Amino acid sequence: MKRSEKYLKYGVKLEDRYLIYEEENRRVAVPYAHIAFLSVSKNNLVIQTNSMEKVVIKLDTEDTANALFEDILVFIQRLYIR
């Protein structure tokens, strides 16, 4: 399974330049270049942007939250290495 598709059951898709998060009645695209703050708290991943928007992604385990955290960091690094 590709890294970008690993989190689809949680409503998260990792693209080359942005993250897409879908909830019941909301769909959000967060460009990696706009992420100012990224943290893991138990099984939640918190993303805050430069404009102070905050997205909280609820995952099933802390390990999954940590894995998503690491994968987002990889995508951010790729963005700035290009």
Predicted regions located by residue number:
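Negatively charged, low-complexity tracts enriched in Asp/Glu with abundant Ser/Thr
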Residues: 1-22
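Acidic, Ser/Thr- and proline-rich intrinsically disordered linker/docking segments
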Residues: 2, 7-8, 27-28, 34-82
